[in-house]
C-alpha cells in the first residue's frame, strides 16, 4: 500500500517533518511518498499547496496525510479545503497545554529554531567544528576537551554519530579509528589510554561492514568479508579486554546510537 504524506509549515518545516516522520515510521507495512513544503506563508502559496495535495489524492486514489505547523489561521483554513487528512500539530498539542498551564501560547513562526534568540547557537557551532576537527583520529592532542571519544573499526558509524551529537546536543565528540596496528598491539593506542574514561566503542556486523566498505573501495582487501570479520572480532576482543562500553550499530539509526551512547556514559546534553 502506498500513500502520499506532506509536511507543511510556514517556517522551516523541521518540526512538522520530524514529528511526522516519527509517526509514519510506526506503519512499516505502508510505503509513503514524502514531501516537505516549508515557508507556505501566503494565501497564494497555500492555494498552490492545495492543488498539489489534490493532485496527489487523484494520483494515489486515496487522500494524502498532511502534517502541518501553520500558525496563520487564513492559511490553515485554505489547506483544510484540500482532499487531505489534516494533522494540525500545533492545535493538537498546544490546546491541552494552554489549558494545563492556564496560559495562551504565542503561536510564533519558527520559535523553536530561532537563531537570534537561541543562546545555544554558538555552542552548537563550536561542537560541530570540534567534531570535524577531531574526526578519524586527526587531532588527538585535543582529546582533553572532548566530552566523549568514539572508537571502532573504519566505517562503523563513528563520524555521523559524532556530528549528530554535536548538532543536536552540543556534545564535543571525537572519534578514533582502530587499525590493524592497534589490534596487533593488543592494547589501546597511547593517544587513547589517558582518556579511557571518555571512550565508547561502536561495533558492527561483519556482513554489514563489508557492504558499506564495498561502496567505498569495491573488490579490495579493505572491503573483503575476511578482513571485516577479522577487524570486528579483534576490536570486540579489545573492548572486552579494556572494559570499554560498546554497542553494535548495525540495526540502529544515528539518533538511537547517540541516545544510547549518552545514557551509557552519563554525558549530559548541553541543550535539549
UniProtKB/Swiss-Prot annotation:
Binding sites annotated in the UniProt record for ADP: 152-159
Residue stretches spanning the membrane: none
EC number: 2.7.11.33, 2.7.4.28
Entry annotated with the keyword Transferase: yes
InterPro entries in the cross-refs: Kinase-pyrophosphorylase (IPR005177), PSRP (IPR026530)
Keyword vocabulary terms for this entry: Kinase, Nucleotide-binding, Serine/threonine-protein kinase, Transferase
GO MF entry, a single one: ADP binding
One Pfam family in the UniProt entry: Kinase-PPPase
Swiss-Prot/TrEMBL catalytic activity: [pyruvate, water dikinase] + ADP = [pyruvate, water dikinase]-phosphate + AMP + H(+); [pyruvate, water dikinase]-phosphate + phosphate + H(+) = [pyruvate, water dikinase] + diphosphate
Protein family according to the UniProt entry: Belongs to the pyruvate, phosphate/water dikinase regulatory protein family. PSRP subfamily.
Biological role stated in the UniProt entry: Bifunctional serine/threonine kinase and phosphorylase involved in the regulation of the phosphoenolpyruvate synthase (PEPS) by catalyzing its phosphorylation/dephosphorylation.
Protein name: Putative phosphoenolpyruvate synthase regulatory protein
Amino acid at each position: 500500500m502506498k500513500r502520499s504524506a506532506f509536511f507543511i509549515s510556514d517556517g522551516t518545516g523541521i518540526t512538522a517533518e520530524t514529528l511526522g516522520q516519527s509517526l509514519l515510521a510506526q506503519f512499516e507495512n505502508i510505503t509513503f511518498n514524502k514531501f516537505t513544503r516549508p515557508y507556505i506563508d501566503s494565501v497564494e502559496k497555500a492555494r498552490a499547496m492545495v492543488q498539489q495535495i489534490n493532485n496527489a489524492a487523484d494520483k494515489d486514489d486515496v487522500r494524502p496525510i498532511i502534517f502541518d505547523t501553520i500558525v496563520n489561521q487564513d492559511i490553515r483554513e485554505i489547506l483544510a479545503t484540500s482532499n487531505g487528512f489534516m494533522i494540525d500539530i500545533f492545535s493538537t498539542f498546544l490546546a491541552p497545554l494552554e489549558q494545563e498551564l492556564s496560559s495562551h501560547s504565542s503561536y510564533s513562526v519558527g520559535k523553536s529554531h530561532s537563531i537570534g534568540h537561541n543562546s545555544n547557537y554558538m555552542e552548537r557551532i563550536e561542537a560541530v567544528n570540534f567534531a570535524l576537527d577531531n574526526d578519524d583520529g586527526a587531532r588527538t592532542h585535543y582529546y582533553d576537551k572532548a566530552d566523549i571519544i568514539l572508537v571502532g573499526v573504519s566505517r562503523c558509524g563513528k563520524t555521523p554519530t559524532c556530528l549528530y551529537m554535536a548538532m543536536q546536543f552540543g556534545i564535543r565528540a571525537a572519534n578514533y579509528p582502530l587499525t590493524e596496528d592497534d589490534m596487533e598491539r593488543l592494547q589501546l593506542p597511547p593517544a587513547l589510554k589517558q582518556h579511557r574514561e571518555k571512550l565508547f566503542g561502536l561495533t558492527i556486523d561483519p556482513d554489514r561492514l563489508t557492504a558499506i566498505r564495498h561502496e567505498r573501495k569495491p573488490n579490495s582487501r579493505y572491503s573483503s568479508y575476511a578482513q571485516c570479520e577479522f577487524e570486528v572480532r579483534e576490536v570486540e576482543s579489545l573492548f572486552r579486554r579494556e572494559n570499554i562500553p560498546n554497542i553494535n550499530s548495525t540495526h540502529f539509526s544515528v539518533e538511537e546510537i547517540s541516545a544510547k551512547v549518552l545514557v551509557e556514559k552519563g554525558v549530559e546534553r548541553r541543550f535539549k
